[in-house]
UniProtKB/Swiss-Prot annotation:
Signal peptide: none annotated. This is Elongation factor Tu. GO terms for cellular component: cytosol. GTP hydrolase that promotes the GTP-dependent binding of aminoacyl-tRNA to the A-site of ribosomes during protein biosynthesis. GTP binds at residues 19-26, 81-85, 136-139. GO terms for molecular function: GTP binding; GTPase activity; guanosine tetraphosphate binding; translation elongation factor activity. Residues 10-206 form the tr-type G domain. Disulfide bonds: none annotated. Mg(2+) binds at T26. Residues 19-26 are annotated as: G1. InterPro entries: EF-Tu_GTP-bd, EF-Tu_GTPase, EFTu-like_2, EFTU_2, G_TR_CS, P-loop_NTPase, Small_GTP-bd, T_Tr_GTP-bd_dom.
Amino acid sequence: MAKGKFERTKPHVNVGTIGHVDHGKTTLTAAITTVLTKKFGGEAKAYDQIDAAPEEKARGITINTAHVEYETANRHYAHVDCPGHADYVKNMITGAAQMDGAILVCSAADGPMPQTREHILLARQVGVPYIIVFLNKCDMVDDAELLELVEMEVRELLSKYDFPGDDTPIVKGSAKLALEGDTGELGEVAIMSLADALDTYIPTPERAVDGAFLMPVEDVFSISGRGTVVTGRVERGIVKVGEEIEIVGIKPTVKTTCTGVEMFRKLLDQGQAGDNVGILLRGTKREDVERGQVLAKPGSITPHTHFTAEVYVLSKDEGGRHTPFFNNYRPQFYFRTTDVTGSIELPKDKEMVMPGDNVSITVKLIAPIAMEEGLRFAIREGGRTVGAGVVAKIIE
């Protein structure tokens, strides 16, 4: 049976549930789809359908993730939920599921737990811009003062990791009651409040085409009589014929002019996000451009060698290393289209990193790469992936 045509009339936003094990992330996910389906149509998903998340591979890493979708009056949401803590770590670091905002689920009966903290830290490190809190299992807490205390703890924890704890929407409810069809304050009403918080607190994300032009260089050709053509897929923004662009990374940044855009052997007057194009550059020699650099709107992105990152190290079963690595480990860092060697500095309290761990590191590359916070990369040894990471903070 053919699926109904996907009507992309409402703006699209990506979200996901995060939080400690057994605090009710999957139950909440099921409750949201159930309650919103009644109101706005769509497809309700039962707990078991979400819990039996299929395996997927992102950059060679196995991750279990459930994807559901739902609609509110104003938006269409794609929502990810992971069964295990390790899946969250991998998901957030690889960016397999980019989140425009996260729903932090915290049990009112238990308060913040170790993974509550770890997921907030991860969200900060990988650049999840907004967090909304669902204080779950409120039906199990009779004491209003206790609820207030838990809410305060969660706000403090958010503030500690540079989220605006005092201004974060916190919805109190019970995912279980909502899922069972309870129409009270803690049931369906709470889910509708959460939907409203999603709609109002998380801004509509900028579309890729509205960003500053950026295209990773995949290949460079010299065409006699025309000049140098650089091919790749436009990651964001638009490039128009006649515009000035910069070549950034590996070598000192240089300015050039786009004198032509080709797609499928046809000449266009512009290339935009998602297009695989060839860009003709005026006065640029073939040897001035190489794979691993980017073409970008002047001043929009800068090259860097020194940064902190959050990384996940593949386990042996995932084809990763069989042994730990230590301070000053020197693998290759694969950014966009090329490998650059770099050295890793571990946190003071970490002597070594075991396969299957995630860790915050500081990296120094031997050549600069066009970089911004939130950029994903792979860690490789002789061409095989041994880790995945995301730039947390640029140092220089």
